Amino acid sequence: MAIREIISIPDKRLRRVSEPVEKITSEVRALAEDMFETMYDAPGIGLAAIQVAVPLRLITMDLAKKEGESAPRVFINPEILSKSEDIAVYEEGCLSIPEYYEEVERPASVRVRFMDLEGEVHEEDAEGLFATCIQHEIDHLNGVLFIDYLSKLKRDRVMKKFTKAAKLAAK
């Protein structure tokens, strides 16, 4: 297991649409393990493979409620089957947009289909934080960031800040 580098905006790879996982191999399992280690180290509650520069449709998530508990989950080739008309607002953050948080409106619940590391296909209803997180991470797989839901003014301001920081870091 290894902690991988999390890429951040303005890195253009974050806008890439990820490819489906064709077969669950030892490499896919190792990637999931690395992603958990990276996510816990950050720390975060969800991570898409593209955030560690691997363009595969794989998500790791841990929404454990209490300190010291763990509820690791892997979602391979996840897809949203249906969305509620009800809207929920959560303050979202992203490991690829460090230390920036903003309220985002999303469907309050979704039905999602995904495969686990054993190759089993599941369908599950997601509500609350789980619904927000799975939508946020699936967006990553499609090259969409949570700042895309903000006004153009806010989005441009965030991109300008991170682009400037990236240029300064490169010097």
From Swiss-Prot:
Its cofactor is Fe(2+). It catalyses: N-terminal N-formyl-L-methionyl-[peptide] + H2O = N-terminal L-methionyl-[peptide] + formate. Binds 1 Fe(2+) ion. Keywords: Hydrolase, Iron, Metal-binding, Protein biosynthesis. CDD domains: Pep_deformylase. It is an enzyme of class 3 (hydrolase). GO terms for molecular function: metal ion binding; peptide deformylase activity. GO terms for biological process: co-translational protein modification; translation. The keyword Metal-binding applies. Fe cation binds at C94, H136, H140. HAMAP family: Pep_deformylase. Belongs to the polypeptide deformylase family. This is Peptide deformylase. It comes from Afipia carboxidovorans (strain ATCC 49405 / DSM 1227 / KCTC 32145 / OM5). The gene is def.
